[in-house]
């Protein structure tokens, strides 16, 4: 079954991003148009829409565009195996755990500050 081809505006609407975001993703090699019209307009297939949604979800989960690029490259590469993807995911999880410890320490410090000011004295 052949994918439906979409203009950049339609893909932006379907994926919930701006056309500028799509152009940026293309510049960063996260996506690429499936083809171009005779006039040079970008045309994207349904896979591009899925890919953009994956990128946005991964960003929402805290992955950087660099992390996402690495995951997408692993997915595209025939030689990539589950172990490669697993290694990237483990490294990301470790970074998140480190950030979480820092945030917990900051939260504890803020709690101490709040408690020290509970009497209303300035």
From Swiss-Prot:
Pfam family, any one: MerR_1
Residues at which Hg(2+) binds: 81, 117
Cited InterPro entries: DNA-bd_dom_put_sf, MerR-type_HTH_dom, MerR_fam
A GO MF label: DNA-binding transcription factor activity
Limits of the HTH merR-type domain: 5-74
Top-rank lineage group of the source organism: Bacteria
Name under which the protein is recorded: Mercuric resistance operon regulatory protein
Organism: Acidithiobacillus ferrooxidans
Gene that encodes the chain: merR
């Amino acid at each position: 079954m052949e994918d439906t081809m979409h203009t950049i505006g339609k893909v932006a609407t379907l994926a919930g991003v701006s056309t500028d975001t799509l152009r940026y993703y293309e510049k960063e090699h996260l996506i690429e148009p499936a083809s171009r019209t005779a006039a040079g307009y970008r045309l994207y297939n349904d896979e591009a829409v899925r890919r953009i949604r994956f990128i946005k979800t991964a960003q929402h989960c805290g992955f950087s565009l660099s992390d996402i690029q690495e995951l997408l490259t692993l997915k595209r590469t025939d030689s990539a195996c589950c172990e490669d993807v697993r290694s990237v995911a483990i490294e990301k999880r470790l970074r998140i755990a480190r950030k979480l410890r820092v945030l917990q320490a900051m939260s504890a410090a803020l709690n101490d500050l709040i408690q020290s000011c509970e009497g209303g004295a300035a």
